[in-house]
Amino acid sequence: MANSPQAKKRARQNDKARAHNASLRSMVRTYLKKVVAAIEAGDAETAKAAYAVAIPVLDRVADKGIIHKNKAARHKSRLNAKIKALSA
């Protein structure tokens, strides 16, 4: 348990940041699920539209360090490959 005033404040700040980061991670997962659902449904146009919406969100979260930039790049690459395979 934090005893000093600054330790108590840091604990409060950490709780707030953790909740915010969890919210952002959840948002990213939701966008990615929409893309995957469109791909599984075989709907290329919906998948492309969902992908176009998800990519800026993914990049923004990666820039903030919520997820690693390589993980964001991996998601983008794999989803794009699946969409291209769907269109071909």
Curated annotation (Swiss-Prot):
Cite a single Pfam family from the UniProt record.
Ribosomal_S20p
Name the InterPro entries for this protein. Ribosomal_bS20 (IPR002583), Ribosomal_bS20_sf (IPR036510)
Region entry Disordered, spans: 1-23
A GO molecular-function descriptor: small ribosomal subunit rRNA binding
Superkingdom of this entry's organism?
Bacteria
GO annotation, biological process: translation
Q: Does the keyword rRNA-binding apply?
A: yes
Keyword list (alphabetical) reads: Ribonucleoprotein, Ribosomal protein, RNA-binding, rRNA-binding
Question: Could you name the Gene Ontology cellular component terms for this entry?
Answer: cytosol; small ribosomal subunit
Q: Which PANTHER family match?
A: 30S RIBOSOMAL PROTEIN S20, SMALL RIBOSOMAL SUBUNIT PROTEIN BS20C
Family membership: Belongs to the bacterial ribosomal protein bS20 family.
Q: What does this protein do?
A: Binds directly to 16S ribosomal RNA.
NCBIfam families xrefs: S20
Spell out the protein name for this chain. Answer: Small ribosomal subunit protein bS20
Q: What is the lineage of its organism?
A: Bacteria, Pseudomonadati, Pseudomonadota, Gammaproteobacteria, Cellvibrionales
